[in-house]
């Protein structure tokens, strides 16, 4: 049986939090089979990342979500492409340079909040989650929830990909530091079940 030449090529060998995994799948022949991408994490756990049909010799894949520190640890990861009996490997490193990667589901909640479908108290739980996970920090604990109405505009921009996670995270951090946003001491964050599948 003929085995095509295959290669997986990353656009970068290192990524920061908030950036999206971006790579090309190159095949010498389209066989009609699917390509399967596996990822091995920093402690050696291997899982299936993606299965995709191949219809041309070169396919670009950009992850729908950026890396965040809740799911993705700093360190080295390996990608393995399997296609029609052929295998190609490459690796990349996640580097914590201080950039902020906010979990993708917070953006979904932001859209609900900015459209008036979620009350401030519920959105504050998402902010509390970011504090609990040390994505942002809450130096002063207040007793009363305060989120200024104008902050919805910034959140709307971020939820619609008009500003980056780092810019939004830094804006949020500034508002907390300046006590413009106050999260009460008894505010509970969302419980996130650890997932065995990587979301990317």
Residue ranges and their predicted role:
Residues 1-21:
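Short, compositionally biased P/S/T/A/G/V-rich stretches that sit at domain boundaries
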Residues 55-66:
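Aromatic sugar-binding surface patches on proteins
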Residues 49-52, 76, 86-97:
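Edge beta-strands of extracellular beta-sandwich domains
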Residues 37, 72-86:
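Short, aromatic- and glycine-rich surface loops/edge beta-strands on solvent-exposed regions
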Residues 105-113, 118, 123-131, 136, ...:
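Fold-core signature of tandem repeat domains
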Residues 21-29:
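Aromatic/hydrophobic beta-strand junction motif of beta-rich domains
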Residues 20, 32, 72-76:
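Extracellular Ig-like/FN3 beta-sandwich strand-entry sites
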């Amino acid at each position: 049986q003929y085995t095509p030449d295959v290669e997986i090529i990353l656009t970068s060998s290192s990524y920061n939090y908030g950036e999206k995994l971006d790579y090309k799948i190159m095949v010498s022949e389209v066989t009609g089979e699917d390509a399967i991408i596996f990822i091995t994490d920093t402690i050696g756990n291997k899982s299936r990342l993606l299965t995709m049909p191949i219809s041309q010799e070169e396919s670009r894949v950009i992850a729908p979500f950026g890396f965040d520190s809740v799911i993705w640890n700093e360190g080295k990861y390996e990608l393995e492409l399997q296609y029609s009996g052929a295998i190609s490997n490459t690796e990349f490193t996640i580097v914590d340079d201080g950039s902020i990667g906010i979990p993708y589901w917070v953006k979904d909640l932001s859209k609900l909040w900015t459209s008036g479908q979620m009350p401030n108290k519920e959105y504050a739980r998402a902010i509390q989650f970011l504090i609990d996970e040390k994505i942002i920090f809450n130096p002063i604990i207040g007793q009363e929830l305060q989120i200024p109405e104008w902050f919805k505009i910034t959140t709307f921009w971020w939820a619609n990909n008009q500003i980056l996670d780092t810019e939004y995270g830094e804006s949020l951090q500034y508002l907390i530091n300046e006590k413009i946003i106050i999260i009460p001491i008894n505010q509970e964050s969302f419980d996130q079940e650890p997932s065995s599948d990587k979301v990317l």
